[in-house]
Amino acid sequence: MNIIDAIINLANNPVVGVESHSQSNNRANQAGDALEEYVKDLFSGSFNLNETQRIARHAKVFSYLGNNSNPPDAMLRNGDAIEVKKIESKDSALALNSSHPKSKLSVDDSMLTKACKDAEKWEEKDIIYIVGVVDKKKNLKHLAMVYGIDYCADAECYLKIKNQIKEGIGNIGGIQFAETKELGRVNRIDPLNITYLRVRGMWGIENPWFVFNYIYQRNMEKSFNFMAIINEDKWNSFNNTDKLLAIQDSKLAISDIKIKNPNNPARLRNAKLITYHL
């Protein structure tokens, strides 16, 4: 299964009420968790299965299922990694917390658990950022799927800044620093030597609709807007694009576009823009 299957499932079965969908199957009703469950069903085509069948389908489609504390949210078996982000406002940025944006997911990433690294034989995976706008009534208003390689710069861009900040903090005189994976940690701040201070980085990135506003604008008069961007190399790697192209639906559109290279915006790359609305 891949992103093409997910888009086909969306067009054939446009479920957009994430809370009612999750509650009907006795699943998490927090909006973020419900969106993650929705995405799993979208990729595995398990919307209409009972819970036992759904679990079995997910085990077949995914090699790993994670959560906020154990990234990524999912890995398609022999396929891409998936990171799901929920925002409540159409213009909100994405909070990535302590993890910088990723163009790819590498097996040597220190944020990954052993279970994730051992889920299958892999070295590097493309990562799909899936962003949903869920309103207060738990309706999915907007959904975007973009690949990290088209959305984020290479890791060295972020690590360079992080390391410069960490080095600068460590060079502050008169303070006892401790080893940490964070930006810094100061021990023994008070006379009793019982207080410490952690210095953490909190990463964020603008949402895909903001980043790609030069090629796509949402129609706010529609109840639901979907956008996916797939670069040409990735599109050509799939063997099921003909099934998507064969769908006859006026609400579904596929067009050729050019997008900016995140590492050098002066260079453009060919891509497909897939849109759908209700």
From Swiss-Prot:
Disulfide bonds: none annotated. Belongs to the NgoPII type II restriction endonuclease family. It catalyses: Endonucleolytic cleavage of DNA to give specific double-stranded fragments with terminal 5'-phosphates. This is Type II restriction enzyme NgoPII. Its EC number is 3.1.21.4. One of its GO terms (biological process) is DNA restriction-modification system. It comes from the Bacteria. Keywords: Endonuclease, Hydrolase, Nuclease, Restriction system. It holds the Pfam family RE_NgoPII. One of its GO terms (molecular function) is DNA binding. InterPro entries: Restrct_endonuc_II_NgoPII (IPR019046). The keyword Nuclease applies. It is an enzyme of class 3 (hydrolase). The gene is ngoPIIR.
